[in-house]
């Protein structure tokens, strides 16, 4: 694409289409132009015209048939992500789809195949660019924590919920609603080249719908860290959002602040395995004991003026998408990667037939 400004159409003007995407694109006027929106509610269409100076349509079909768009953002309700994205790709239209991309890996396969039209499918997994997550990856890759044994991802709180995203028919529930963010991060650390062994427990605690609002997932694999991922709506005392256990130290924190602590093996006392009972200098039974020199560091997120961490993630994703569409930069988030995410979630549903009769 040679055009320097990408013409965007947005499907949906709700919490995602307006509050996340449209407001994010307004910050990047040198790269993107909101040309049109589509929403079934008249008041939302009127508001979009006033706020963004764009055209507005009642249906996405009208929008794409009447506008020359370079990109369509699919921020429709979750259960419509797959069918609308599939139709757009078949029409040769580039798509940026909100999470969840689909419900099953088979649906993702159809979306990947539909790119034969020449259109590109991108996925809005903006948490991949969470500053705290990027810092975590930097710390892990530095090696100071040693071999990573376990990583915990926790998205917990206490809430009762009774809206459309509590229904299975709408692709609701904590797994498909909140899950795409931490599961994507977890799989980035686990590795996208191997399907993990999945263990999952689900419950319906405080939801008024038929989908789950408690999810516990354990991911394992040879030579990979164990992933402990929890999404709960019944946690009055939530744990840290991130916890890492390593052979030389560990990390804890959240999207705002991280703290990590480690020792340096080359400074540690030299030890050898002793197979006989341990005794102290007086000959009394003893436990293993040593003095390690610990190093501790921390990081705090400092967002650019006028932006919060969430807006930074959105801004980063759109800038990278722009580079892919106009400069030929390789995409960092691919539907092939998200297929693994859908496969993990499908296995989670399969293991919980008391909630999901079909995976």
Each predicted region: which residue ranges?
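C-terminal helix-rich "cap/oligomerization" subdomain common to oxidoreductases
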Residues: 1-5, 71-73, 302-359
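Beta-loop-alpha module in the N-terminal Rossmann-like domain of NAD(P)-dependent dehydrogenases
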Residues: 52-112
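Predominantly a Rossmann-like dinucleotide-binding segment in NAD(P)-dependent oxidoreductases
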Residues: 127-208
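Rossmann-fold dehydrogenase core element
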Residues: 110-126, 147-152
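Charged, glycine/proline-rich intrinsically disordered loops and linkers
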Residues: 264-305
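N-terminal Rossmann-like dinucleotide-binding module
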Residues: 1-52, 354, 358
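Contiguous beta-strand/loop segments that form the cofactor/metal-binding neighborhood of enzyme cores
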Residues: 177, 184-269, 307, 315-329, ...
